[in-house]
Amino acid sequence: MSGVRAVSRLLRARRLALTWAQPAASPIGARSFHFTVDGNKRSSAKVSDAISTQYPVVDHEFDAVVVGAGGAGLRAAFGLSEAGFNTACVTKLFPTRSHTVAAQGGINAALGNMEEDNWRWHFYDTVKGSDWLGDQDAIHYMTEQAPASVVELENYGMPFSRTEDGKIYQRAFGGQSLKFGKGGQAHRCCCVADRTGHSLLHTLYGRSLRYDTSYFVEYFALDLLMENGECRGVIALCIEDGSIHRIRARNTVVATGGYGRTYFSCTSAHTSTGDGTAMVTRAGLPCQDLEFVQFHPTGIYGAGCLITEGCRGEGGILINSQGERFMERYAPVAKDLASRDVVSRSMTLEIREGRGCGPEKDHVYLQLHHLPPEQLAVRLPGISETAMIFAGVDVTKEPIPVLPTVHYNMGGIPTNYKGQVLRHVNGQDQVVPGLYACGEAACASVHGANRLGANSLLDLVVFGRACALSIAESCRPGDKVPSIKPNAGEESVMNLDKLRFANGTIRTSELRLSMQKSMQSHAAVFRVGSVLQEGCEKILRLYGDLQHLKTFDRGMVWNTDLVETLELQNLMLCALQTIYGAEARKESRGAHAREDFKERVDEYDYSKPIQGQQKKPFQEHWRKHTLSYVDVKTGKVSLEYRPVIDKTLNEADCATVPPAIRSY
């Protein structure tokens, strides 16, 4: 408890624990670089002028560094510290400001508190939800670990909603069933009313304060430090004073979240800018399946704010301008609780066919007022408040205007189920030494072409923990940290300096808006080849316009203009890979719906018996992962593909789910 009290005192004083070395330009009395949970611990920081004489550069050494302090980053960081590793956590936000806090609906686990359940049924639903693009070994691992992960959170103090007999309350969520799709709707989503992400993030942060982790708060990670194909840490900018920090570590975990802000209308925080995805791209490593962008069915019309799927899990329904519960036509069994890609497309079709609501007929309604007010007050208190603030709607009396809104990135940094980052060489997966990824920044791939609601929070805690366990299996605390070249990170500092003094003709905000509107119009719920091709050309042209940016703040203390410009560079790399991957994929699968290629293209035609069919060659079908690379100088995108993993971790314990026609 002494460590916790020490941190509490530090935070109240708004200062950080001293390091051995202050940067050369640090003003007297300024807040120091970072705090540790143990206020007596000191870092091995050393001032260096090897890469810049204009910017204060400080070198640090740790066993491991985690980039990002959302759910996945915190779980990885304190898992490593718990195992005895000297761990740093670099985050551009205070941990409890991370976007995990915005998750509403819940976290899936087959606890069986509402009816009989089995993790294998959860496994089946997740594979089906992925439209058979998910890797079944990773899905096996996640769903089997789910019950223990939720119990662990409960033991950490997460205040789950309860049933009358005191068990964790579980609500219905989309795409989830019992008995391998034959037993009706499952109630598998554990929740804290409609504020589950908020509770999870604060629970994990509170738990992390038990351990001696060094937090670099409000530090912007610029790039990975790569040498000889290995990751040896990160280079970061201290936003507060402009100093540069090279954090050398034997193991680096990327947990920076998604890149929803590539789109104009999204539920993501403004800080969801794909920083880790872009860092990996600049390191010459591939990203995977970025064309699969999830549109959440129920974003508030006009504002884009998330209205949780839990509303429909509690009994809410979608209606069109005729008052019709239209999902019965598109998903006769699951209805409003079909998977998100199915519901989003159905809503879009209703609007296209003239059954939209409002003066412009450009949205539909989510009706909740038929539910008891007591149920809304207990199970959906946050939604009631959000609807009133952003839509002016009293949910007990009138429906909420909603529209599909960008919500989640299924793609990301390719990893195996242990969290190890992969590259694809000569048709084989190879682990990138020293580099791990988890959370929305990663692509394990447990979500495939479409994520099931409430599997994202599960993904965070399962794979954040997996990264820590994997590192503990292969390394020991205190192992020698590999060296880096004296000028490591020099290009990152040169880029920073170039942006700081950029004197072109385009504002960062203007270019960002052009990119967001282009992505919104060219890579939306429904996609078509000609529009995607036009989008590729436009995004590539906008990428070139990065050379013509103008920044206005030349300072180094809290230069948010500079930080937003760095974020725009990251967003552009994500946007390029997303739209080029979408244009190349000539099929419809999960969240990627092509109007000119409406069918899923598998190795067999699974609408018919496969006996007697000839298997399509790998080059002729699309049940495969996209790997994308970008030439950072030109913006040219290169694509290749790797097979989906169909085998589970133990076929005797959990059999592979063979592809089938997906319906709800």
UniProtKB/Swiss-Prot annotation:
Active site: 340
UniProt enzyme class: oxidoreductase
Modified residues (Phosphotyrosine): 215
Chain segments annotated as coiled-coil in the UniProt record: none
Post-translational modification: Phosphorylation at Tyr-215 is important for efficient electron transfer in complex II and the prevention of ROS generation. Acetylated. Deacetylated by SIRT3.
Subcellular location: Mitochondrion inner membrane
Residues the record lists as binding FAD: 69, 72, 91-92, 98, 100, 105, 221, 275, 440, 456-457
Enzyme Commission number: 1.3.5.1, 1.1.5.-
Membrane topology per record: Peripheral membrane protein
Pfam families: FAD_binding_2 (PF00890), Succ_DH_flav_C (PF02910)
Modification type N6-succinyllysine: residues: 179, 335, 485, 498, 538, 615
Residues noted as binding oxaloacetate in the record, renumbered to the chain: 296, 308, 407, 451, 454
Parts of the chain that traverse the membrane: none
GO biological process entries: mitochondrial electron transport, succinate to ubiquinone; nervous system development; succinate metabolic process; tricarboxylic acid cycle
Modification Tele-8alpha-FAD histidine occurs at: 99
Transit sequence range: 1-42
Function (record text): Flavoprotein (FP) subunit of succinate dehydrogenase (SDH) that is involved in complex II of the mitochondrial electron transport chain and is responsible for transferring electrons from succinate to ubiquinone (coenzyme Q). SDH also oxidizes malate to the non-canonical enol form of oxaloacetate, enol-oxaloacetate. Enol-oxaloacetate, which is a potent inhibitor of the succinate dehydrogenase activity, is further isomerized into keto-oxaloacetate. Can act as a tumor suppressor.
Family note: Belongs to the FAD-dependent oxidoreductase 2 family. FRD/SDH subfamily.
Protein name per Swiss-Prot or TrEMBL: Succinate dehydrogenase [ubiquinone] flavoprotein subunit, mitochondrial
Organism whose genome encodes this protein: Sus scrofa
Taxonomic classification: Eukaryota, Metazoa, Chordata, Craniata, Vertebrata
